[in-house]
């Protein structure tokens, strides 16, 4: 049987090598080259030379707006009285973009939208929650990272809140529904988004990236 097998390998050596090389190439491609030209540009250059990855998103479907078209001060939808004070309830808006930098001290993420860079301000505790990385502790004592910070360069997010001057401040009311932050896992060809509001489960630690 081994002689038959050896003869078959000898006769088909070139085809076998071509098939093997093709499979190795595809495995490496899937591992290292997932995404598109725009995502590669962001990963390597930190800017888009071609179209923004989110340029074809169905903005109407997700209620996404252009930050720079919003009034510089938030619009008051209604007010309610709390003691002697009148508390405003603001109209909330959503924007989306690609994270290009962050300031841990100020709990700020710099978001490259399709119309420009926006400074997005989070509450400190909320920022810290999504800036950490989750990991799994292995039996040999080593750690396997499950998910890094949502605010690392290249990650795409949707944020909900208000414009205040030159800054977008994330906000959510109990009555508003939804979340103030979503991670964009995938952009589909029809303009739909695969969104996620929860962190990947695992132990947490400081991300270690500025």
Positions of PLM-derived features:
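Noncatalytic, beta-rich nucleic-acid-contacting surfaces in large DNA/RNA-processing enzymes
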Residues: 1-210
């Amino acid at each position: 049987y081994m002689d038959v097998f050896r003869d078959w390998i000898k006769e088909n050596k070139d085809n076998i090598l071509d098939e093997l090389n093709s499979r190795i190439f595809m495995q490496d491609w899937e591992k290292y080259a997932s995404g598109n030209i725009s995502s590669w540009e962001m990963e390597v250059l930190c800017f888009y030379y071609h179209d923004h990855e989110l340029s074809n998103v169905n903005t109407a479907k997700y209620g996404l707006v252009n930050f720079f078209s919003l009034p510089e001060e938030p619009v008051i939808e209604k007010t309610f009285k709390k003691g002697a004070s009148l508390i405003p309830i603001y109209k909330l808006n959503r924007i989306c973009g690609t994270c290009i930098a962050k300031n841990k001290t100020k709990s700020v993420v710099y978001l490259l939208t399709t119309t420009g860079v926006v400074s997005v301000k989070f509450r400190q505790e909320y920022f810290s929650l999504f800036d950490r990385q989750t990991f799994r502790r292995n039996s040999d004592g080593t750690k396997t990272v499950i998910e890094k910070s949502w605010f690392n360069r290249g990650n795409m997010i949707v944020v909900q809140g208000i414009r205040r001057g030159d800054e977008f401040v994330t906000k959510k009311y109990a009555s508003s529904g939804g979340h103030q932050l979503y991670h964009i896992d995938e952009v589909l060809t029809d303009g739909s988004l695969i969104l996620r509001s929860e962190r990947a489960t695992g132990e947490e630690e400081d991300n270690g990236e500025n």
